[in-house]
Amino acid sequence: KPGHGGHKGQLERRLHMVRSLWTAATGMIAQQTNVDTIANNLANVNTTGYKTQVNEFKSLLDQNIQTKTTSANGDTKPSSAQVGLGVRNASISSVFKEGSLTASDSDTAFAIDGKGFFAVRGADGNTYYTRNGNLKFTLASNGGNMLATSEGLPVLDTQGRPIVLSNNYVMSKITVSKDGSLCYPDAQNNPQPIGITIGVFQFNNPNGLERLADSLYQQTAASGQAINEATNNNVERSSIIQGYLESSNVQVVDEMVNMIVAQRAYELNSKAITASDEMLQQANNLRR
């Protein structure tokens, strides 16, 4: 049929341009998520114990536009022709590199030197984990003084119980050794353990933890069960440093560079959409 091949070729070209529109759109969506992640890192640059998040990408399926075949003289071509269909966000992972330690005037400021996490009891009764050691003593519901987070969540000891001290202790005199033992001065003003130790827990895969609000993490199947440093001799134990807080590990300069790269990638993908749209309009005009 006359002209049939020409119409078919025009249709294929238009389909290819529509494909480029969607491919560039996936790039814009991925870079928008990347910018969102970077903005969140910068917003938490002063959040105690915050861990930088990194956006990871994965390419979408490639489409075969020509399979392996032979040339005019019968020789086999070495490869096929494939075109990519875009990109997607594969994961947003946390970088659990330790942040720098900042001195604090608070007696209940604690930093963890190592891979461990503090354990806290949530309002729903579940156990959550955090690197934020900005703690305080509050009045317990059944009397005494309870070690808690700034949100009022009880901090747990090595037995998984809330840390509650009787009113016989002067809270300002409580000290904590590097192994997490709570100590109180004797008559000679020498600190003596009182039989309570702050719990510190590790995970085989901390990147598998689910991030929650208030710098909390929740255990998942991907993270594995919490490992109690006090009862497991196969892990390198962390140290608790009183009078210090762990700063966010966000590197502002790195995030600004990442922001510029993401912005440029977003801009180039938008230009690809504009170019594809103009080419599609020109192809449509050929039919007139």
Feature annotation, model-predicted:
Residues 4-288:
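Amphipathic alpha-helical polymerization modules
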Residues 1:
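Active-site anion-handling motifs in enzyme catalytic cores
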